Structure formats: C-alpha cells, structure tokens
C-alpha cells in the first residue's frame, strides 16, 4: 500500500489517470441530473402528469444519494476503496439502462432514486481516496480543478438536454450516461490505488454506530457539514426549479433557459480556478472568508430584485452568478477543513458529511419548490438567501477558533 501511496503522490501519468477517471464518473452522475432536468418537461408529457413532477425527479435522485452513504464509507474502509468504487460505476450504468423499461412517472421516479445511490460512491469512497492519496496543498488544487471538469455538467447539461429533446427521445440520454460510466470503470480499474487504512477489520453495526456517534459529537465537524449543505442548496434548488421558472414561468424558450445557465456556472468555474491559483498562498480560512462576500451578496441581490419585481430574471441571474463565484472560491477549503476536523477514518467522516448534505438538499429542494409555487420568484430567492445566511452563521461558529484553517493550505 505504501508503494501505491508514494507513487500516487509523485503525480505521474498513472496517478493523474485516477482523478481523471473519477471525475468522468462524477461527470456522468452529475450530467445524469443536469441534462435530464430540461428534458423532464418531455418526460412529464410522456407520462401524462403535471409539471410539479419536474423538480421531484431531482429530489428523488438526491435522496438516493443519501441512502447508502452511512454504509459505503465504512465498508470501503474495511474491504477497500477500489472494489467498492468499481462496483459503483457498474451499478450506475445498470440503473441508467433499467430506467428505459419504466412505463409510469412513479416507476421513473423510483428508478431516479436508485440511480441517485450512485452519488454515494463519489463522496464516501472516491473523494476520500483522493484526500488520502495526495498531500494537502496539491489535494486542494486537484479537488478544485476536478470540480471544474465536473461543473461542465451543469454548464453544458441544460444546453445539451434542451437540444437533445428537440432532436432525439429523452430515453437516449440514459444510454449516454451508461456509456460514460462504463468508460470510467475501465480507467478506474487500471489506475485507482488502494488507500483504505482499516482493511480486514470486521464490519460491526454496533461499532459503526459508535463511530458515527463520535463523528457527530464533534461540533466543528457538524458546523462544517451543515455549512457545506447550505452553501450548495441555492445552486441545487436553482437547477431543480429553473426549467419551470424560466420556461413555464417567464415564457422563454429552452434555448434561453440554457443560455441563462452559462453565466452562473461559468462564474462557478471561475471561482474554482481562482481557488486553485490561491491555494497554498492563502490560509484556508481566508479563502472561505473571501468567498463569503460574493456568496451572501449575490443571494441578497437575487432576492431583493425579485421581491421588487417578480420578473426580474436577469437580475436574479446576475445575483446567482455572483453567489456561484463565491461558492467556487470557498467550498473546497471548507470541505477539507470539515473532513479533517475528526480523527475518525475518512470513509466514515466523508459518509457522514454526505448524508448531512444530501438530507439538506433533498428537503431544501422540495421547500424551494413550494416557496416558488406559493410566492413566485421572490419567495424562491428569499429562501435561497436564508440558506446563505445559515451558511454564514455556521462558518462564523466554525472559524471562531482562530487556529482553524490558519496555515496556508490547511
């Protein structure tokens, strides 16, 4: 195992193939959500149901992403990250093909839940292996750059999905997702190292419960995990609800819908690139503080503009773009601080983080949907602002200890 770790840290071609293939799998699972969302308007027409099912597809997907987090992280600690990750890539491909057999919206939503379980493998297994494979400053840069590749999904997904449903049946998207996952499997099979530290230990449910209890008793971890969830919630609520807001609510075309995503996710990528440049030069706490201003300020602009004029969707887009830059700058460092706030094995810690975040996303997207149904764009963006303010309060509590994140890259 030491040979694996040392060779990985040297960042050779084989070592770089591992994060590239992991991000290909991540891209497949993300585009499995972002590309299908504009296509959901065609899906609900196929099954003869109303548009309230559009965001529910994403809710089911993220609920699946929470379902097995508690097990996969500790399981990969004990039997190895590599076999668990490889099974995950094959599982996602299989569920993407199985959804082609559905004949009702209920069956479709159930399959979306089962597909969402594939998200569990990214944080609880894949990213834990990344964190264990590279030294800290290099790891933050790799994580930020990997995020840029993964973020092509929400940048291109809406455009590609809107174009796809005009040219091809929506079912063909899932064949594409399966093909990408199988390609990632081949690369991971060749290049993924084994980094698990507790291999061979027996998996005991009582011991597992004790591990999670110890993790959740850590206040810094709890604040960081909740903050990670509330930081990304406005973005995910936007992805889920924006087809209805833009196409049905504002009466714009699917092309306009896709183009309105470009500044938001373009700024998210710019924030990640800025983070990659500053990482190692600035303390992590400073990077988080720098990201706080555009995050909260952007959400405030979106809320104020749409409360003043319900159809100010360009101001809403501008505010969300500013917010997206902030989250790109702050989130990778926050994830790192939270993951290493506990001395427990990283598979368990990462799984606990994932469950907390996915619970916030699953519940929050549904709350955001009803906020829009009851109060339109203003209420939806006010909900997002509240999420941002909760993030700010949690960050303030987490960074109360002046030593947390003080060293550059730590």
Swiss-Prot record:
It is a multi-pass membrane protein. The keyword Disulfide bond does not apply. Monomer. This is Multidrug transporter MdfA. Efflux pump driven by the proton motive force. Confers resistance to a broad spectrum of chemically unrelated drugs. PROSITE patterns: MFS. Residues 37-52, 104-109, 166, 248-255, 308-313, 368-375 are periplasmic. Keywords: Antibiotic resistance, Cell inner membrane, Cell membrane, Membrane, Transmembrane, Transmembrane helix, Transport. GO terms for molecular function: sodium:proton antiporter activity. The chain crosses the membrane at residues 16-36, 53-73, 83-103, 110-130, 145-165, 167-187, 227-247, 256-276, 287-307, 314-334, 347-367, 376-396. GO terms for cellular component: plasma membrane. Residues 1-15, 74-82, 131-144, 188-226, 277-286, 335-346, 397-410 are cytoplasmic.
């Amino acid at each position: 195992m030491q040979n694996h770790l040392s060779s990985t840290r040297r960042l050779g071609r084989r070592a770089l193939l591992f994060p590239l293939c992991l991000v290909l799998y991540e891209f497949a699972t993300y585009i499995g959500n972002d590309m299908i969302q504009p296509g959901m308007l065609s899906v609900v027409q196929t099954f003869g149901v109303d548009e309230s099912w559009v965001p529910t597809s994403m809710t089911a997907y993220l609920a699946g992403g929470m379902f097995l987090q508690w097990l996969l992280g500790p399981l990969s600690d004990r039997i190895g990250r590599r076999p668990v990750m490889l099974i995950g890539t094959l599982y996602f491909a299989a569920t993407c093909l199985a959804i082609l057999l559905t004949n009702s919206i209920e069956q479709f939503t159930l399959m979306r839940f089962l597909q969402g379980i594939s998200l569990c493998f990214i944080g609880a297994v894949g990213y834990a292996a990344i964190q264990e494979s590279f030294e800290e400053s290099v790891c933050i840069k790799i994580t930020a750059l990997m995020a840029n590749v993964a973020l092509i999904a929400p940048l291109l997904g809406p455009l590609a999905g809107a174009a796809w449903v005009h040219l091809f049946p929506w079912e063909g998207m899932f064949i594409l997702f399966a093909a990408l996952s199988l390609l990632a499997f081949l690369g991971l099979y060749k290049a993924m190292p084994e980094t698990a530290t507790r291999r061979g230990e027996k998996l005991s449910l009582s011991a597992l419960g004790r591990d999670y209890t110890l993790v959740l008793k850590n206040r810094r971890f709890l604040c960081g995990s909740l903050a990670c969830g509330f930081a990304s919630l406005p973005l995910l609520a936007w992805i889920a609800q924006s087809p209805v807001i833009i196409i049905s609510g504002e009466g714009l075309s699917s092309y306009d819908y896709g183009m309105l995503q470009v500044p938001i996710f373009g700024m998210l990528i710019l924030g990640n690139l800025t983070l990659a440049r500053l990482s190692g030069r600035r303390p992590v706490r400073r990077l988080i503080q720098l990201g706080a201003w555009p995050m909260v300020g952007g959400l405030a602009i979106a809320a104020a503009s749409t409360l003043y004029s319900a159809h100010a969707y360009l101001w809403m887009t501008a505010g969300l773009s500013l917010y997206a830059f902030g989250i790109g700058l702050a989130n990778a460092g926050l994830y790192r601080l939270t993951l290493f706030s506990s001395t427990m094995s990283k598979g368990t810690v990462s799984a606990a983080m994932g469950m907390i975040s996915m619970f916030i996303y699953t519940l929050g997207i549904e709350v955001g949907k009803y906020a829009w149904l009851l109060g339109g764009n203003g209420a939806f963006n006010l909900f997002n602002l509240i999420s941002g303010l909760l993030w700010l309060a949690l960050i303030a509590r987490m960074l109360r200890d002046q030593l947390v994140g003080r060293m550059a890259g730590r």
